[in-house]
Amino acid sequence: MTDEETLDPQDWTELRALAHRAVDDAVDYMASLRERPAWEHAPAHVKAHFAGPAPAGPQPVDEIYAEWLEYVRPYQLGNSHPRFWGWVLGTGTPMGVIAEMLAASTDAVCGIYSFVANNYVELQVLDWCKELLGYPLEAGGLLTSGCSASNLIALAVARNAKAGFDVRGEGLAGAPAGTGGAPERLTVYCSAEAHSSLTKAVELLGMGTSSLRRVPADDAMRIDLDALAGMVAEDRAAGLRPVCVVGVAGTTNTGSIDDLPGLADFCAAEDLWFHVDGAFGAWAAIAPESRRLVAGMERADSLAFDLHKWMNLTYPVGCVLVRDAQAQLDTFSLTPSYLAHGEGDRGLTAVDVPWLSDVGFELSRGFHALKVWMSLKEHGTEKFARVIQQNIDQARYLEGLVAAAPELEQALPAQLNIVCFRYVGRGGGGTAPDGAAQEDPDGAARDNAALDQLNKEIELELQERGIAVPSVSTINGRKYLHVAVANHRSRREDFDLLVREVVRLGGELSEG
């Protein structure tokens, strides 16, 4: 008789010892982040370590763990470090680590089956999000892996709700005939500054990239409402069918916030679905001093946002809220016979809370909600609001440092928590911050090209030396250092150091 096998350890004591060590090492790592480089470039031998075939036989767990410590942990993105500001990524929290471990310990599934506590946790978290962001409690919603998924879900609901025909049953080929007899094309509108996930969403929804109308931005990098109105009118006159406008609460490049009340009014007047991509900026709504910045967001038909960005929860967890819960259900609900449920009061398929698999495209879903639930309980919403306001205040502090340094030039005033500036040297160079050309346009172009290259090199030196992690944004054709302040571990002295190092490196690189 063949012995039956399991993937459990033969010696639970050995596993317990490793688990205790792993927890101790993880806590030590988090507690010492400030002492570590902001980022470390993985050397060639680390990359080479991950070549080779899958192991046919077992390896001692201590050796596997040693590989993690030597080859993986030191070479992370660095977003948990206090001086990581290159992109809005969030930094994680210790409670999030514990929550992820607890969820994994039960191999937790969420969103399907009845009388499973995980579902109750997610539904409560969704209600908390609605409450915090001023959304009606009767709205639909779902936790996701992030705003890429959230935007996809929201645009799918918008497409189906506003298409004017049965998209689920007929597909886009079922659209009524437009100009020239071809099926009427559905169109979506967003700012030229809106996130690339919207492009992927319209592609995946079968609408095609050409159906996403990128509207010019104004001088403040917000969607131009007059241009939007003109594009919608022109498309209708050409036989197209506009269905949705996307407003952005915090653009990736500059943190700019579209005129959300204006967009809400426009969509109401034009019978268009109003979606807001609030990936990080939506959370300004919970900070009393800054809530006004995202006023109008609560009027959206759908709202996408992340909790792993400005709420600093462990990756991944995002959310989508849909004002018309039935429209979300109509877009995604599907119950095959092997998942029939909703009868009786006993067993895993009895009448209980709604199955969240009916309001999104995923059936297999992890327990994203636990880290949100535990972290909000640990700190309370008021502390999260204070941290968000702290970041906004730190961005204003950084703006002051930049203004006080004659070698630096800011691209445009920060609307939220992103500051974009560049090193120009004491003599300046290129064009003025408002884009006005200098007297010698050819010389200005040369200066701008040199400054672009110089600021890119400053970015790389800051990263490679482990000093700090900014990124580079292109604004009005010029490159600026991009500092996204969404880090609960950052302190004002970190920004003092950043400015000193930018000025120092700029001077060194200019001379060299």
Regions found by a protein language model. Give the residues of each.
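Well-ordered mid-protein domain cores that form the structural environment of catalytic cofactors
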Residues: P94-P183, S191, S197-L198
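PLP-dependent enzyme catalytic core of the Aspartate aminotransferase-like
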Residues: G443-A445, T474-G512
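Amphipathic alpha-helix from the class-I
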Residues: T6-D8, W12, W373-R386, V424-G430, ...
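Conserved PLP-enzyme active-site core in the AAT-like
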Residues: A149-L329
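N-terminal entrance/gating region of PLP-dependent enzymes' catalytic architecture
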Residues: T2-E138, Q463-A468, L481, A486, ...
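Active-site C-terminal subdomain of aminotransferase-like
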Residues: T251, E270, I286, A295-A405
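Conserved PLP-binding catalytic core of the aspartate aminotransferase-like
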Residues: Q410-G430, D434, D440-L462
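Short beta-strand
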Residues: E409-A414, P470-I475
